[in-house]
C-alpha cells in the first residue's frame, strides 16, 4: 500500500506520536511517502481542525476525499490529553470509522480512569462549544449563533440557570445581557489537569 503521511503540518504535540505511527506503517512493508504529494492509496494527517499549523491539512483532506480515498486522522484522545490518542478513518468522533469492531475490554483499565454515574439533576444546564474551524463543525452555524440557538431552545422548556462554555481554543464574543440567568465560563488552560483545561 502507498501511504502519504504529513507530519510537517501537525501541532507541536504530534511529533512523537506521528513518528511512531509512520514507523509502524513502514514496519508492515507499506510504502510511506513523508511530507510530499503522491498518488497514494491513503493519506495520514493530524486532526481535522483547519487552523494554525494544521490549516494545510484541509487541502490534503479534500484531495483524498474528493478522490474517494480514505484519510487516516490522528488526534489527541478524549480521555487524557497527550497520553491517549485517537486514530480513525475519514474523521474523528461520530463521523469516523475507528475500526474497533474487534476490540475487547482489556484496554480500558490501562487508562486508570473510573466512570462516574451520569447526573440527571443539578442546578445548571451546561452548553459546551465545539471549535467552529473544525471539519466536525462543517455545515453548522458560527459558534455564537449556535450558542444563541441553544439558549433560545432551552428557554422554551425551563428557566433554570444556563452556563455557556466555549471550546478552550475557540474564543467567542457572546452578548448575554439580553438573556436572564445565563452566564459564560471561559475555559482556563491548566497543564496540571487531565485535558490541559480546567473543568470548573
Describe every region a protein language model picked out.
Residues 1-51, 133-134:
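N-terminal pre-catalytic "stem/leader" segment of glycosyltransferase-like enzymes
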Residues 6-10, 148-190:
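Catalytic donor nucleotide-activated moiety binding site of glycosyltransferases and closely related
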Residues 11-18, 52-56, 81, 135-136, ...:
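Short, charged/polar "capping" segments at the starts of alpha-helices
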Residues 15-23, 53-59, 141-153:
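Well-ordered, non-membrane alpha-helical segments in soluble/globular domains
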Residues 32-33, 70-72, 162:
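Hydrophobic beta-strand scaffold residues
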Residues 37-40, 119-121, 172-181:
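Short loop/helix-cap segments at secondary-structure boundaries that form the rim of catalytic
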Residues 42, 187-200:
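A donor-sugar binding/catalytic signature common to diverse glycosyltransferases
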Residues 69-140:
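A nucleotide-sugar donor-handling region in carbohydrate enzymes
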Amino acid at each position: 500500500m502507498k501511504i502519504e503521511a504529513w507530519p510537517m503540518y501537525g501541532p507541536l504535540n504530534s511529533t512523537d506520536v506521528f513518528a511512531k505511527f509512520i514507523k509502524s506503517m513502514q514496519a508492515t512493508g507499506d510504502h510511506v511517502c513523508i511530507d510530499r504529494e503522491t498518488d497514494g492509496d491513503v493519506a495520514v494527517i493530524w486532526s481535522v481542525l483547519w487552523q494554525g499549523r494544521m490549516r494545510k491539512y484541509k487541502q490534503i483532506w479534500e484531495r483524498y476525499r474528493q478522490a474517494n480515498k480514505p484519510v487516516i486522522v490522528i488526534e489527541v484522545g478524549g480521555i487524557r490529553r497527550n497520553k491517549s490518542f485517537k486514530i480513525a478513518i475519514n474523521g474523528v468522533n461520530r463521523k469516523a470509522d475507528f475500526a474497533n469492531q474487534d476490540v475487547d475490554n482489556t484496554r480500558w483499565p490501562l487508562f486508570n480512569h473510573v466512570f462516574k454515574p451520569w447526573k440527571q439533576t443539578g442546578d445548571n444546564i451546561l452548553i459546551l462549544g465545539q471549535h467552529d474551524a473544525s471539519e466536525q463543525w462543517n455545515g453548522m452555524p458560527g459558534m455564537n449563533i449556535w450558542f444563541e440557538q441553544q439558549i433560545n431552545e432551552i428557554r422554551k422548556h425551563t428557566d433554570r440557570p444556563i452556563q455557556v462554555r466555549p471550546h478552550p481554543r475557540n474564543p467567542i464574543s457572546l452578548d448575554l445581557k439580553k438573556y436572564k440567568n445565563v452566564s459564560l465560563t471561559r475555559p482556563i488552560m491548566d497543564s496540571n489537569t487531565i485535558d490541559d483545561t480546567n473543568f470548573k
